[in-house]
From Swiss-Prot:
ATP binds at G31, V32, S33, G34, A35, G36, K37, T38. The complex is composed of two ATP-binding proteins (ModC), two transmembrane proteins (ModB) and a solute-binding protein (ModA). It is a peripheral membrane protein. Part of the ABC transporter complex ModABC involved in molybdenum import. Responsible for energy coupling to the transport system. This is Molybdenum import ATP-binding protein ModC. It is found in: Cell inner membrane. It comes from Salmonella typhi. Residues 289-352 form the Mop domain. One of its GO terms (molecular function) is ATP hydrolysis activity. The keyword Cell membrane applies.
Length: 352
């Protein structure tokens, strides 16, 4: 668990934190350039020194301004992966990995190398590696120091799209298989969508939202960040049943369910789905004899005008679902907050 309660001057703004981050999973730190993302993880790692407050990791005080405590970076047991891999060019991959390796990690070397898929790279020099391969080695080196926390500062920012796609599955595997919390700095919505368990949104050094990805993604804070074509809902669901006659799987959403193409997932397993706002239409009465398999009872929470369209925020079993309709449809159906209606979901995609 990481306790952040500090403030630090950030240009014309002040970075102010009073949050507790979880002891596992990936927490994404999101915001535009200058929002305070890198300043936050630099303060956590000990590269900078906040003028007020405390930083505590798993009960260990890393920084306490009032009592004059400020552990040096090497004493904090924190791994840091930068945008550029920063490997030693004269060491082979094996040497880079073993540099600074904790004795306690000796028995984990082969497992971690396999997890990152870098077995074939061990005897190569960094100059012969692709950008994605270098970053995998950098992540491995950071993990072999036996950190209690891993910081990743936009590790995919310098990579082209094919290399990003190459690295994402390895990061997903790490999140599932290692019991180390990770802070992942990014301004990429796609990376956050595929990796994050929780999201912290920073703006001018202030926390605008912090919580599970599903909640933050569907909040009004995140809504302006999403391009019109990406306006969507992220929902955490569980596998309810597999259809006895058709290749379809039912996913539980509160006391309702969604049908999707058959999944090779055991019953009760959890996963994350994405529904585009443009794939949701609204009706006042449950339709009869429709080809759309997913019709959900929902309550209108809010309506927002957006460049000639209307974004409708719906509540379904405590979750948020977005729909995009025309002003004509809104006016004709008299859609307003508090109205109960039915949402027809035309398409569902699985994200994680």
């Amino acid at each position: 668990m990481l306790e952040l309660n500090f403030s630090q001057t950030l240009g014309t703004h002040c970075l102010t934190l009073n949050e507790t981050l979880p002891a596992s999973g990936i927490t994404a730190i999101f915001g535009v350039s200058g929002a305070g993302k890198t300043s936050l993880i630099n303060a956590i790692s000990g590269l900078t020194r906040p003028r007020k407050g405390r930083i505590v990791l798993n009960g260990r005080v890393l920084h306490d301004a009032e009592n004059g405590i400020c552990l040096t970076p090497e004493k904090r047991r924190i791994g840091y992966v930068f945008q550029d891999a920063r490997l030693f060019p004269h060491y082979k991959v094996r040497g880079n990995l073993r540099y600074g390796m904790a004795k306690s990690m000796t028995g984990q070397f082969d497992k971690l190398v396999s997890l990152l898929g870098i077995e074939a790279l061990l005897d190569r020099l960094p100059g012969s590696l692709s950008g994605g391969e270098k970053q995998r080695v950098a992540i491995g080196r950071a993990l072999l120091t036996a950190p209690e926390l891993l910081l990743l500062d936009e590790p995919l920012a310098s990579l082209d799209i094919p290399r990003k796609r190459e690295l994402l599955p390895y990061l997903q595997r790490l999140a599932r298989e290692i019991n180390i919390p990770m802070l992942y700095v990014s301004h990429s919505l796609d990376e956050i969508l595929h990796l994050a368990d929780k999201v912290m949104v920073l703006e001018d050094g202030q926390v605008k939202a912090f919580g599970p990805l599903e909640e933050v993604w569907g909040s009004s804070v995140m809504h302006p960040w999403l391009p019109k074509e990406q306006q969507s809902s992220i929902l955490k669901v569980s596998v309810l049943e597999h259809h006895p006659h058709y290749a379809m799987t039912a996913l539980a959403l509160g006391d309702q369910h969604l049908w999707v193409n058959k999944l090779n997932q055991p019953l009760q397993s959890t996963l994350r789905i994405r529904i585009q706002a443009s794939d949701v239409s609204l009706v006042l009465q449950p339709p009869q004899q429709t080809s759309i398999r997913n019709v959900l009872r929902a309550k209108v929470a809010n309506c927002y005008d957006d460049n000639g369209q209307v974004e409708v925020q719906l509540e379904i079993g405590g979750r948020t679902l977005w729909a995009r309709i025309s002003p004509w449809a809104r006016d004709e159906l008299n859609i307003k907050p508090g109205l109960w209606l039915y949402a027809q979901v035309k398409s569902v995609s699985i994200t994680a």
